[in-house]
Amino acid sequence: MAGEVSAATGRFSLERLGLPGLALAAALLLLALCLLVRRTRRPGEPPLIKGWLPYLGVVLNLRKDPLRFMKTLQKQHGDTFTVLLGGKYITFILDPFQYQLVIKNHKQLSFRVFSNKLLEKAFSISQLQKNHDMNDELHLCYQFLQGKSLDILLESMMQNLKQVFEPQLLKTTSWDTAELYPFCSSIIFEITFTTIYGKVIVCDNNKFISELRDDFLKFDDKFAYLVSNIPIELLGNVKSIREKIIKCFSSEKLAKMQGWSEVFQSRQDVLEKYYVHEDLEIGAHHLGFLWASVANTIPTMFWAMYYLLRHPEAMAAVRDEIDRLLQSTGQKKGSGFPIHLTREQLDSLICLESSIFEALRLSSYSTTIRFVEEDLTLSSETGDYCVRKGDLVAIFPPVLHGDPEIFEAPEEFRYDRFIEDGKKKTTFFKRGKKLKCYLMPFGTGTSKCPGRFFALMEIKQLLVILLTYFDLEIIDDKPIGLNYSRLLFGIQYPDSDVLFRYKVKS
């Protein structure tokens, strides 16, 4: 009854407001936005670029061509400047020798505050902002993504790859045509999900995975909007899709999954310690972990395959390297799936790794972001800069990745860019000085992706199988650009797709 009265009152008030009242409300809202951007540069602060749009600031310029726009600002204002972007003031530090200013100031520049706010907006996880102990315990679970635990994951992953490839793809003896992005997303999603979460044992697992993947991709498509300040109610059916995915991780559904990984089991144990049994926020945590596991791996796999398909010399070098490794370990490609490579053997494939790193260099827009907890002065060799409490400070690696002083012809794909004298190349220079950071697709410092080893091994394993067992040819041999829809978050989508064809080698 109270709800009906409230709703009726709301309608009555809106009607009474009329057009003049609505115009006044709109004017007041515009005034509030203008007051928000009335900020002026204080002495000691970096140059301030607010753009001409209230609240949005420079977002349209940045979305159009991020790298060119940032390089233009760098040329005009230097390596450090502050921009208004979607209601937030972000100070960008572009000099790679000043990155430590962001990385080392843990107390004043917080990743946790920023990430917890992001988790609440994107996945509806609220408790992490209040419970630091749970945050710390969940962080400890990442130990199961490295060392011996990673070896166990890789073994499980290989078994899952066999079950995906043997009954379906290995029967493709004549040419089959597919779009590259759906091909990559289908395989990566299934392999990742079954390796981490296990398989559903009481229903059609393939149908479950297919439906979950489709819902996940719809959710991920709106991720950039979710983490902005746009209300989720304005994003179509994203809220209902998110709720549907979260319910896939209810205690009832989890009981039907067999083959949990150590990292998933440990996270579930921590969550059950801090939440009541049926709390849907447990499922929200699992959705967040699923997003972190596949949202960047899928486009990385796409770009790695795309560049190998378009560059025959790269494909030939990687295939030759894989063949030599198989011969040296006494393994042969036969019927079924006899190939088995350890983590150390996968790490020895330097042409393959260099090709993946080069694809990441060209497609990664992963931005290291910190929340300023108190007014702070950043002191560097080139000067001191003041940043304000409540602002954000960021490192924008695409400027580093596209620097011709560091990478010759940075717009080109060169599969051997990270190889020197037959070994992994880890030494790069700028202004005659060695760089500590030269490739940053996984972030840096406290925000460095804890699942990077798992993701790289997954892509390496999958590429080894595809290049060993299949003939692969690109049909649409055309240049593909970046979509920029996930501007500051991870690996960018392609702005279009390409057709390729594949068949089992005779």
UniProtKB/Swiss-Prot annotation:
Subcellular compartments: Endoplasmic reticulum membrane; Microsome membrane
Activity regulation note: Inhibited by drugs voriconazole and metyrapone.
Cofactor(s) in the UniProt record: heme
Pathway membership, UniProt: Lipid metabolism; bile acid biosynthesis; Steroid hormone biosynthesis
GO molecular function: 24S-hydroxycholesterol 7-alpha-hydroxylase activity; 25-hydroxycholesterol 7-alpha-hydroxylase activity; heme binding; iron ion binding; oxysterol 7-alpha-hydroxylase activity
Tissue expression from the record: Widely expressed. Expressed in brain, testis, ovary, prostate, liver, colon, kidney, small intestine, thymus and spleen.
Catalysed reactions, as listed in the record: 25-hydroxycholesterol + reduced [NADPH--hemoprotein reductase] + O2 = 7alpha,25-dihydroxycholesterol + oxidized [NADPH--hemoprotein reductase] + H2O + H(+); (25R)-cholest-5-ene-3beta,26-diol + reduced [NADPH--hemoprotein reductase] + O2 = (25R)-cholest-5-en-3beta,7alpha,26-triol + oxidized [NADPH--hemoprotein reductase] + H2O + H(+); (24S)-hydroxycholesterol + reduced [NADPH--hemoprotein reductase] + O2 = (24S)-7alpha-dihydroxycholesterol + oxidized [NADPH--hemoprotein reductase] + H2O + H(+); (24S)-25-epoxycholesterol + reduced [NADPH--hemoprotein reductase] + O2 = (24S,25)-epoxy-7alpha-hydroxycholesterol + oxidized [NADPH--hemoprotein reductase] + H2O + H(+)
Pfam families: p450
One GO CC annotation: endoplasmic reticulum membrane
Signal peptide: none
Binding site for heme: C449
Membrane topology label: Multi-pass membrane protein
EC numbers, comma separated: 1.14.14.26, 1.14.14.29
Family recorded in the similarity comment: Belongs to the cytochrome P450 family.
Disease per UniProt entry: Spastic paraplegia 5A, autosomal recessive: A form of spastic paraplegia, a neurodegenerative disorder characterized by a slow, gradual, progressive weakness and spasticity of the lower limbs. Rate of progression and the severity of symptoms are quite variable. Initial symptoms may include difficulty with balance, weakness and stiffness in the legs, muscle spasms, and dragging the toes when walking. In some forms of the disorder, bladder symptoms (such as incontinence) may appear, or the weakness and stiffness may spread to other parts of the body.
Function per UniProt: A cytochrome P450 monooxygenase involved in the metabolism of endogenous oxysterols and steroid hormones, including neurosteroids. Mechanistically, uses molecular oxygen inserting one oxygen atom into a substrate, and reducing the second into a water molecule, with two electrons provided by NADPH via cytochrome P450 reductase (CPR; NADPH-ferrihemoprotein reductase). Catalyzes the hydroxylation of carbon hydrogen bonds of steroids with a preference for 7-alpha position. Usually metabolizes steroids carrying a hydroxy group at position 3, functioning as a 3-hydroxy steroid 7-alpha hydroxylase.
Protein name: Cytochrome P450 7B1
